[in-house]
Amino acid sequence: IFTKIADIGSDLMKIVFKIKEDDARNPGVIADCTGDNAGDSVGPTADGFETYGVTGVALITFILLAVADPTVQVQLLVWIFVMRILMIGTSVASYFINEAYASSKYLKADKMNFEAPLTSLVWLTSILSVAVTYVVSYLMIPDLAGDTTLWWKLSSIITCGTLAGAIIPELVKIFTSTESSHVKEVVTASREGGASLNILAGLIAGNFSAFWLGLTITGLMGIAAAISTGFPATLMLAPAVFAFGLVAFGFLGMGPVTIAVDSYGP
């Protein structure tokens, strides 16, 4: 938090005194660089790693406590672990596919939009992850607990999380892309009004963006909860809680790609 405060203060002083990004006359440059690194790379990576582990442990614990049938427990646990491994695999495969596509398209191009290959990577990973989720679930749990519909219901819940991982970057891009009207408004406010107007313009854009992100997450979690109402009554306790965990599981399945895109920064 302290480095981010110094980072923001340093950036504002650059605007006020019209000095360059890494000008030694600005004593906040070191804190600025530290804050940028902490905010764009180290922070998201650490948070992602922690959440990645916590979500997996939470789902495993829930299955052991809420599912009464030992056979169903084992099937769900094996399915969860296989899904985790395959999601990492789809991220790696998507990277190489996207790299080949981007190289063929931009290798000899005079100009390049650096956001385009990142966006295509996110969507390619999400589409591949969804396809793999349904196929593998059908092969692994076609009649879980004697119910032949659970494989696609569980896959659909995970897909809600995967879609969140693809839709949220698009919403973020609306408020952070260099081509965004909101970003251009902040730039104009910074140029014409100085630090105070810059802060106000940024707060407005930030609060507006948070509304759409929250609405998206709420909607997808609502869909997951609705699907969970179709679970057999004897399958587990509190199926909606398990559904919310699977949404987070699907969202974090794109963790490697999300962190890579976040590290690029707007």
Provide a role label for each language-model segment.
Residues 1-266:
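Hydrophobic packing and interface segments
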